[in-house]
Amino acid sequence: MAKILVVDDDLDMCQIISDILKEGGYSVNSSYNGEDALMKIKKNHYDLIVLDYKLNEISGLMVLEKALQTIPSLKVIMISAFGDKSIKARARELGVSDFLDKPFDLKRFVQAVQDILNRKTNK
């Protein structure tokens, strides 16, 4: 069973994403801020991180950068209500696996999760 960390400072969004993933049979942990997320990433093995761009203390891009420095093979889906092309470009430069704009289509989200986890398994 794949283990996924959901990071979003919007508690409702975090719960919705977590519930969707749990219904899909995944083991899910949640984090509501970047510092907590980084601690969890260092202490646990996650197959995938679902990471919001805009967090309270530190940006999702900073979390992405630090997480990938710790675990270069980590797979990350970044989500954002801000469809700014420069944010997406920077996330891709840092190594994000996928980037979804909020609100996102649930089928598209679930498919992105499955595709990324399947690629990780096949490597």
PLM regions: where:
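C-terminal output helix
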Residues: 86, 104-113
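Acidic catalytic/metal-coordinating carboxylates
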Residues: 33, 59-62
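Short amphipathic alpha-helix used as the core "switch/output" element in two-component signaling
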Residues: 39, 61-72
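Alpha4 helix (beta4-alpha4-beta5 surface) of REC/receiver domains from two-component response regulators
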Residues: 62, 83-98
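The feature encodes the CheY-like receiver
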Residues: 14, 56, 84
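Active-site beta3 strand of CheY-like receiver
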Residues: 45-50, 55
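Two-component/phosphorelay signaling modules centered on CheY-like receiver
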Residues: 11-29, 94
